């Protein structure tokens, strides 16, 4: 097979038109509508009508103005009584301000605070000084933290939530 080299055309537009006339594909005979080339919208496909009966309500400075405007339009349209906003919020404001929260309240609960002699939990009769894991057959296992020591000194067999998982399994 021999290949021939065609000289470059002087006018590209005319050259392309000549090639299209020689080739003449079937798709050139198809007629397309003169509308927009974009695909149809969902409104066109499903015959959905847009509801434009509600007028646009702009933002206003006062809620009272919005209440009177909306009540006038709803009473005339549907006959329903308008909903009114109570003058005072039924939810009381939160009394805690950021200034009243102490730094101690923001500490992690796993870091146990140390109690001094003036604290009501740490009394003079307290013998608990450090973390310990002792077993007394008459009392049972004792896992040490300041909260557990307070309850155990009062003859209450209780463990705090941090010491409970450390305790031995009871059968």
Swiss-Prot record:
Signal sequence bounds: none
Q: Where is this motif: Nuclear localization signal?
A: 166-171
Biased composition annotated in UniProt, kind: Pro residues: 84-96
Q: Listed GO molecular functions?
A: zinc ion binding
- Protein location: Host nucleus
Q: Does the keyword Transcription regulation apply?
A: yes
Q: Which GO terms describe its cellular component?
A: host cell nucleus
Zinc finger (unnamed) residue numbers: 145-163
Motif LXCXE motif, interaction with host RB1: which residue numbers? 106-110
Q: Which InterPro entries match?
A: Aden_E1A (IPR014410)
One GO term (biological process): symbiont-mediated suppression of host innate immune response
Keywords noted in UniProt: Activator, Early protein, G1/S host cell cycle checkpoint dysregulation by virus, Host nucleus, Host-virus interaction, Inhibition of host innate immune response by virus, Inhibition of host interferon signaling pathway by virus, Inhibition of host STAT1 by virus, Interferon antiviral system evasion, Metal-binding, Modulation of host cell cycle by virus, Transcription, Transcription regulation, Viral immunoevasion, Zinc, Zinc-finger
Q: Where is this region: Interaction with RB1 in competition with E2F1?
A: 40-48
Q: Identify the stretch(es) annotated as Disordered.
A: 67-96
Question: Main location per UniProt?
Answer: host cell
**Organism domain of life:** Viruses
How the protein assembles, per its UniProt entry? Interacts with host UBE2I; this interaction interferes with polySUMOylation. Interacts with host RB1; this interaction induces the aberrant dissociation of RB1-E2F1 complex thereby disrupting the activity of RB1 and activating E2F1-regulated genes. Interacts with host ATF7; the interaction enhances ATF7-mediated viral transactivation activity which requires the zinc binding domains of both proteins.
> Which family does the entry's similarity section mention?
Belongs to the adenoviridae E1A protein family.
Function recorded in the entry: Plays a role in viral genome replication by driving entry of quiescent cells into the cell cycle. Stimulation of progression from G1 to S phase allows the virus to efficiently use the cellular DNA replicating machinery to achieve viral genome replication. E1A protein has both transforming and trans-activating activities. Induces the disassembly of the E2F1 transcription factor from RB1 by direct competition for the same binding site on RB1, with subsequent transcriptional activation of E2F1-regulated S-phase genes and of the E2 region of the adenoviral genome.
Q: What is this protein called?
A: Early E1A protein
What is the species listed in this Swiss-Prot or TrEMBL entry? Canine adenovirus serotype 2 (CAdV-2)
């Amino acid at each position: 097979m021999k290949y021939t080299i065609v000289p470059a055309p002087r006018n590209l537009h005319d050259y392309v038109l000549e090639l299209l006339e020689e080739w003449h594909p079937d798709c050139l005979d198809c007629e397309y509508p003169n509308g927009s080339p974009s695909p149809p919208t969902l409104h066109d496909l499903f015959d959905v009508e847009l509801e434009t009966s509600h007028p646009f309500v702009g933002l206003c400075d006062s809620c009272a103005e919005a209440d009177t405007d909306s009540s006038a339009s709803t009473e005339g349209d549907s006959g329903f009584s308008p909903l009114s906003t109570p003058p005072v919020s039924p939810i009381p404001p939160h009394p805690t301000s950021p200034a009243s929260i102490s730094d101690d309240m923001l500490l992690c609960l796993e870091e146990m605070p140390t109690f001094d002699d003036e604290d009501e939990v740490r009394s003079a009769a307290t013998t608990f000084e450090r973390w310990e894991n002792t077993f007394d057959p008459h009392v049972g296992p004792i896992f040490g933290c300041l909260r557990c020591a307070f309850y155990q000194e009062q003859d209450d067999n209780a463990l705090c939530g941090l010491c409970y998982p450390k305790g031995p399994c009871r059968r």
